[in-house]
Amino acid sequence: MAAMVRGWSGRLRGALVASVLVVTACASGPRAPGPPSAYLGTVVDTPVSASVADLPLITDAGQVTSLAAWHGQVVVLTDFLTLCQETCPLTTGNLLMMDRAVSAAGLARRVRFVELTVDPNRDTPSRLRAYRTLVGAPANWTLLTGSPAVIARIWRYFGVWYQQVAEGNPPGTDWLTGRSLTYDIAHQDALLYLDARGRERFSVVASPNATGAPIVPALRRFLNAQGRANLSRPDASTWTAAEALSPIAWLTGEMIRLPAN
């Protein structure tokens, strides 16, 4: 369950389209891509504290790592849970589209996509591996879990809210085990961009517009009524894969376009 929090409330879709065209125009000219539009999110320039960057996390491969492990790469960090029925499958679909564009631009080794759970009690490494296999996550993706205390500390540091809530009625059915779900996690939908020096540079707080995104059938079936509405009728406050590429272009200094379908 995603909390109804938006980063672009009240913005005009036409203004957003115009701003994206400006970024694209800058990228195609002699200068490097400029900062993303304020309609998309917030430009920041804050070093991630070592007390957070060095916290131990566990990858889907069962290896211990930390956010500091990707210094030297641009990191796109998002919160998620594998049992989200409203927005996380849509976010994953958009990130897959973005990754294809990054790879097509020859930047796969310079950009790391990281999905860090807000449900550490259920999202074990083995479950994250199953999710990776299900969605076909590329090599430059990392799915992360950790102790509840570490997960809470990291997301509190970045200002991303989440909370355990009651499961809906009727409850959803786990796409992996076939069992009924017993609780849900309400959470903000955030995209955080860290530069190669490990500094937070841009943040987006909004739900995804996943029109045309590659969402696997199992996760489409897993969506609840709100999730299906989010997929078929995205509102004007949502972000698209094309829009979310602009911070990566800015931080890498390279033009990035979504490949033609």
Where are these regions (language model features)?
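N-terminal targeting signals for export/organelle localization
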Residues: A2-I58, A241-N261
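Short, small/polar residue-rich loop motifs at catalytic or cofactor-binding pockets
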Residues: A50-V52, V74, A186-Q188
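A short beta-strand-turn-helix
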Residues: L55-V75
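Short active-site neighborhood of thiol/selenol oxidoreductases, capturing the structured segment around
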Residues: A68-L95
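Structural microenvironment flanking redox-active thiols in thiol-disulfide oxidoreductases
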Residues: T92-I154
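Thiol/selenol-based redox catalytic cores and closely related redox-interacting motifs
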Residues: P138-Q226
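C-terminal lobe and adjacent flexible extensions of AdoMet/dcAdoMet transferase-like proteins
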Residues: R197-N261
